[in-house]
Amino acid sequence: MDSNTVSSFQDILLRMSKMQLGSSSEDLNGMTTQFESLKLYRDSLGEAVMRMGDLHSLQNRNGKWREQLGQKFEEIRWLIEEVRHRLKTTENSFEQITFMQALQLLFEVEQEIRTFSFQLI
């Protein structure tokens, strides 16, 4: 796992948690929760790849891991669309920078999860 990605996640989550977007703050908390969930999922896939013989363990623990993987990609696509929408609608430069970095991070995480999953297949 790349330490820059971990610090990027922590930085963006911290920034998003400090944003006050009025009535949409509940939506933002949901996005933050999904970011955290994706980070944990990506980390668990990365650990499984590091152990390389762990595919059978992963399949036994979660017989529907491919279905779960598909759901994670759907979550990523949804988050990307949400972040893009917020980026278009906000005029606050701090929020724009944060959402641009969040978007970049989502693309990186999507690529990492895709790479990990191909190694496990």
From Swiss-Prot:
Q: Which UniProt keywords apply?
A: Host nucleus, Host-virus interaction, Transport, Virion
Cellular component annotations (GO), alphabetically ordered: host cell nucleus; virion component
Q: Which GO terms describe its biological process?
A: exit of virus from host cell nucleus through nuclear pore
Localization per record: Virion; Host nucleus
Q: Which Pfam families match?
A: Flu_NS2 (PF00601)
UniProt key word Glycoprotein:
no
- Entry keyword annotation includes Manganese: no
Task: Give start-end ranges for motif Nuclear export signal.
Answer: 12-21, 85-94
Q: Which family does the entry's similarity section mention?
A: Belongs to the influenza viruses NEP family.
HAMAP family per record: INFV_NEP (MF_04067)
Any idea what job this protein has?
Mediates the nuclear export of encapsidated genomic RNAs (ribonucleoproteins, RNPs). Acts as an adapter between viral RNPs complexes and the nuclear export machinery of the cell. Possesses no intrinsic RNA-binding activity, but includes a C-terminal M1-binding domain. This domain is believed to allow recognition of RNPs bound to the protein M1.
Quaternary assembly:
Interacts with protein M1. May interact with host nucleoporin RAB/HRB and exportin XPO1/CRM1.
Tell me what else is known.
Average number present in a viral particle is estimated to be 130-200 molecules.
What is the protein name stated in its UniProt record? Answer: Nuclear export protein
Provide the species name.
Answer: Influenza A virus (strain A/Wa-182)
